[in-house]
């Protein structure tokens, strides 16, 4: 009986994968980092600034609890799997 209980505990821990948190790419370093508890979405924001014709769009990557609201002249996309917001 003890063996069965121990087996169930081990299987539960493996299935839950305790300690594994949700991660997204974040700027400014564009590296994968764990998100805060409750932040289960990754987002990508992009927009043109005064230097857009020289260096391209400004990119912001990060985690969010909800998808950031739409903003004029900003492209915003959200996704819900680990590291799904790769640099465009």
UniProtKB/Swiss-Prot annotation:
<keyword id="KW-0872">Ion channel impairing toxin</keyword>
<feature type="signal peptide">
    <location>
        <begin position="1"/>
        <end position="21"/>
    </location>
</feature>
<feature type="disulfide bond">
    <location>
        <begin position="35"/>
        <end position="63"/>
    </location>
</feature>
<keyword id="KW-1015">Disulfide bond</keyword>
<feature type="disulfide bond">
    <location>
        <begin position="48"/>
        <end position="52"/>
    </location>
</feature>
<dbReference type="InterPro" id="IPR045860">
    <property type="entry name" value="Snake_toxin-like_sf"/>
</dbReference>
<dbReference type="InterPro" id="IPR054131">
    <property type="entry name" value="Toxin_cobra-type"/>
</dbReference>
<dbReference type="InterPro" id="IPR003571">
    <property type="entry name" value="Snake_3FTx"/>
</dbReference>
<keyword id="KW-0008">Acetylcholine receptor inhibiting toxin</keyword>
<feature type="disulfide bond">
    <location>
        <begin position="79"/>
        <end position="84"/>
    </location>
</feature>
<comment type="similarity">
    <text>Belongs to the three-finger toxin family. Long-chain subfamily. Type II alpha-neurotoxin sub-subfamily.</text>
</comment>
<comment type="function">
    <text>Binds with high affinity to muscular (alpha-1/CHRNA1) and neuronal (alpha-7/CHRNA7) nicotinic acetylcholine receptor (nAChR) and inhibits acetylcholine from binding to the receptor, thereby impairing neuromuscular and neuronal transmission.</text>
</comment>
<protein>
    <recommendedName>
        <fullName>Long neurotoxin 31</fullName>
    </recommendedName>
</protein>
<dbReference type="Pfam" id="PF21947">
    <property type="entry name" value="Toxin_cobra-type"/>
</dbReference>
<dbReference type="GO" id="GO:0030550">
    <property type="term" value="F:acetylcholine receptor inhibitor activity"/>
</dbReference>
<keyword id="KW-0800">Toxin</keyword>
<dbReference type="GO" id="GO:0005576">
    <property type="term" value="C:extracellular region"/>
</dbReference>
<dbReference type="InterPro" id="IPR018354">
    <property type="entry name" value="Snake_toxin_con_site"/>
</dbReference>
<dbReference type="GO" id="GO:0099106">
    <property type="term" value="F:ion channel regulator activity"/>
</dbReference>
<keyword id="KW-0528">Neurotoxin</keyword>
<keyword id="KW-0964">Secreted</keyword>
<keyword id="KW-0732">Signal</keyword>
<feature type="disulfide bond">
    <location>
        <begin position="67"/>
        <end position="78"/>
    </location>
</feature>
<keyword id="KW-0629">Postsynaptic neurotoxin</keyword>
<feature type="disulfide bond">
    <location>
        <begin position="24"/>
        <end position="42"/>
    </location>
</feature>
<dbReference type="GO" id="GO:0090729">
    <property type="term" value="F:toxin activity"/>
</dbReference>
